[in-house]
């Protein structure tokens, strides 16, 4: 038996044991496992297969692939990568549209104004994508802890925010983008993959940025845990800067 910590997740208590990911169980885990099981039965091969729950942990099948991390992988920084990300977002959205949660499902964002809309992943950033480096394509979408209801198009706008990227050059350079950043070309490519106009996508990005920021700001020290942690470290300040950047880009 091998037992190795999931890269970058040691503080979250995640370990990989013989091809199974063991993660601490949350009050949302049963709902997420029902969703993941449904995705598997629906033929969506990019999400982890649920492998059980007990009182302390959830278990998921490990997905082979290259974790994104920082800086962004060369492929995702290419126009083909932006187009592939847009197509992925559309495919994910189309599949999730058919899902119906189990009765009494509890998601991490459980109730309130921010828990409305179709079920979505909730955190589709490059950091949760796995890549097949040899084939140059997305081979996995992990960390479904923030799955649940969200405004229509939330996942697509969220991913576009970081793939295009809709943030200032300093923040983009921290993620590995090299000047000059071809935001016009990347936005066009992402929209080609997703299937809407650039103006419509920019509206989605701002909507996703604002929704994410509001989820953080309305969190309390009692939860939801992920948003409470982000609030504690001041991520909302960075998001507000990104919202301003995106709106200025829209107006230019």
Residue ranges and their predicted role:
Residues 74-75, 148-150, 170-173:
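Short, polar/flexible loop-turn hinges at active-site or ligand-entry regions and domain interfaces
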Residues 2-121, 125, 132-137:
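ATP-binding pocket architecture of kinase catalytic cores
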Residues 113, 125-166:
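Catalytic activation segment of kinase domains across protein kinase-like and atypical kinase folds
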């Amino acid at each position: 038996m091998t037992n190795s910590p999931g890269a970058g997740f040691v503080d979250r208590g995640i370990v990989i044991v013989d091809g199974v990911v063991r993660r601490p169980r949350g009050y949302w885990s049963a709902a997420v496992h029902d969703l993941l099981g449904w995705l598997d039965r629906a033929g969506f091969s990019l999400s982890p297969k649920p492998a059980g729950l007990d009182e302390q942990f959830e278990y998921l099948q490990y997905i082979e692939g290259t974790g994104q991390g920082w800086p962004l992988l060369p492929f995702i920084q290419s126009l083909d990568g932006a187009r592939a990300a847009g197509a992925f977002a559309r495919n994910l959205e189309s599949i999730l549209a058919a899902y119906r949660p189990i009765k009494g499902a509890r998601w991490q964002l459980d109730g309130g104004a921010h828990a409305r809309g179709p079920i979505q992943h909730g955190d589709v950033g490059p950091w949760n994508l796995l890549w097949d480096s040899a084939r140059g394509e997305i081979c996995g979408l992990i960390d479904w802890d923030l799955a649940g209801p969200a405004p229509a198009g939330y996942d697509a706008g969220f991913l576009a925010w970081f793939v295009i990227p809709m943030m200032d050059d300093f923040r983009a350079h921290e993620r590995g983008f090299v000047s000059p950043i071809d935001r016009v070309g990347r936005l066009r490519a992402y929209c080609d993959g997703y299937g809407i106009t650039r103006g419509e996508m920019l509206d989605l990005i701002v909507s996703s940025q604002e929704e994410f920021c509001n989820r953080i700001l309305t969190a309390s020290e009692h939860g939801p845990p992920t948003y409470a942690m982000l609030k504690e470290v001041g991520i909302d300040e960075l998001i507000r800067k990104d919202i301003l950047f995106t709106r200025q880009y829209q107006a230019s």
